[in-house]
């Protein structure tokens, strides 16, 4: 069974620089460390600085849905000013150039 990737994004109330976004993300990142079912999270900021979010790799959709609760969505809206958008995608294969391998997830 392949892992599930969740692409979460939200519109920001005002333009953010990369330094501002990094500081903003550092404030929430500790809560994701050692989170059950979460394998990896990459934060992102769009080039125009108006949209941000995260790309999460989960063991399963169920693990992701245990986190993306009504309360979590309300937290995101209160912190960033807009509702998060969540897109789930299957990730059957990984090309890892750092390790020089291709593997099934």
Regions found by a protein language model. Give the residues of each.
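Short S/T/G/P-rich N-terminal loop/turn motif that feeds into the first structured element of a domain
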Residues: 1-52, 61-70, 82-105
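A common structural junction motif
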Residues: 73-79
